[in-house]
């Protein structure tokens, strides 16, 4: 089955074609980073308008690059949530309308399920079950994944997400948007041992996270030291955040008796996190899997893939063929999803 995937939950417009028999056929992405940079963060109304401008040209692009035809589509998948309501509606409206016109089923995909399954797009996907670290600007969760749609929440952030902490710390250090990558580049030139920062909840005995205290500690440090030691502060923050993510993730693997760990989401592109998890995972007998760097951030490929897995169910396809509802879910718990029948 050839599935078109549409991602428009925040500040990236992504479109992709996934063939159940051939794999990923084509994908295209437009990032709004340059547009939002002047505002220091995502402006929802601007994001929605830009999705409207980009979504059709990107759709044409993936069909032209792949040589596939609209008539070959077996289904359409779009991000239904969580995310910005207006941005989500752009992709949902496009997906439902196209599916209705072609008389094929459409399915709303959970954004985090797309991230969680993105490493499975590779040539060497992890086998089930595995523990997944979902780590992005809006979410930080540890999940036990038994199969597609069978997710057990092990722990999550109690306040700020890891990616949010990276971005806010970057703002404190006078860096641009998006802050996470800029902070990591600055940290590479710093001394992580220069300043001692807390590792919140590292030894709490559970799998929950908290990054607000770490962010506050950085604020206190910046007020005391100024920005003359910005590289060292960035390095100390990154080391502290990575320590917590690595420690909690491997503890969750031990708890679940899982020897496979999947890392997904934008923070999964962080080089220090990848280096530490791979090294310490290896010592613990845990194989660590990552999506390719281009699929760490939001993209249409992960939505097309996740949609294809769910549309593989004949019953699901029949049920969705006449479904015209394109309501979105700005808030949507991943653990509430049902399994693929």
From Swiss-Prot:
Report the top EC class in one word.
transferase
Q: Which cofactor does it need?
A: Fe(2+)
Gene Ontology, cellular component aspect: cytoplasm
User: What subcellular locations does the record give?
Assistant: Cytoplasm
Which cysteines are disulphide-bonded? none
Q: Sorted alphabetically, which PANTHER family does this protein's record hold? A: TRNA N6-ADENOSINE THREONYLCARBAMOYLTRANSFERASE, TRNA N6-ADENOSINE THREONYLCARBAMOYLTRANSFERASE, MITOCHONDRIAL
- Tell me the protein family, please: Belongs to the KAE1 / TsaD family.
Protein name, as recorded: tRNA N6-adenosine threonylcarbamoyltransferase
In its UniProt entry, the species of origin is given as Thiobacillus denitrificans (strain ATCC 25259 / T1)
């Amino acid at each position: 089955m050839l599935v078109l995937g549409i991602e428009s939950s925040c500040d990236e417009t992504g479109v992709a074609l996934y063939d159940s028999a051939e794999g990923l056929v084509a994908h295209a992405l437009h990032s709004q980073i340059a547009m939002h940079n002047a505002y220091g963060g995502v402006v929802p109304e601007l994001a929605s308008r830009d999705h409207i401008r980009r979504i059709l040209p990107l759709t044409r692009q993936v069909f032209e690059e792949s040589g596939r035809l609209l008539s070959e589509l077996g289904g359409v998948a779009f991000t239904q949530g969580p995310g910005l309501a207006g941005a989500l509606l752009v992709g949902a409206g496009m997906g439902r309308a196209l599916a209705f016109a072609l008389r094929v089923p459409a399915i709303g995909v959970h954004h985090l399920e797309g991230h969680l399954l993105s490493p499975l797009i590779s040539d060497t996907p992890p086998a089930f079950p595995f523990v997944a670290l979902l780590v992005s600007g809006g979410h930080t969760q540890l999940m036990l994944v038994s199969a597609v749609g069978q997710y057990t929440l092990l722990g999550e952030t109690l306040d700020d997400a890891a990616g949010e902490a990276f971005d806010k710390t970057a703002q404190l250090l006078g860096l641009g948007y998006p802050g996470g990558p800029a902070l990591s580049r600055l940290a590479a030139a710093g001394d992580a041992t220069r300043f001692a920062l807390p590792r919140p909840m590292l030894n709490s005995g559970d799998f929950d996270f908290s990054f607000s205290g770490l962010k506050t500690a950085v604020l206190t440090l910046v007020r005391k030291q100024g920005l003359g030691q910005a590289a060292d502060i960035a390095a100390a923050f990154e080391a502290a955040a990575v320590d917590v993510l690595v420690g909690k993730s491997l503890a969750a693997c031990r708890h679940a008796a899982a020897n496979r760990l999947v890392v997904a989401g934008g923070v999964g592109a962080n080089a220090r996190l990848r280096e530490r998890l791979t090294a310490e995972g290896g010592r613990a007998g845990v194989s660590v899997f990552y999506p390719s760097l281009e699929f760490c951030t939001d993209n249409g490929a992960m939505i097309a893939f996740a949609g294809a897995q769910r549309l593989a169910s004949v019953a699901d396809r029949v049920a969705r063929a006449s479904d015209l509802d394109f309501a979105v879910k700005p808030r949507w718990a991943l653990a509430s999803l049902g399994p693929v029948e």
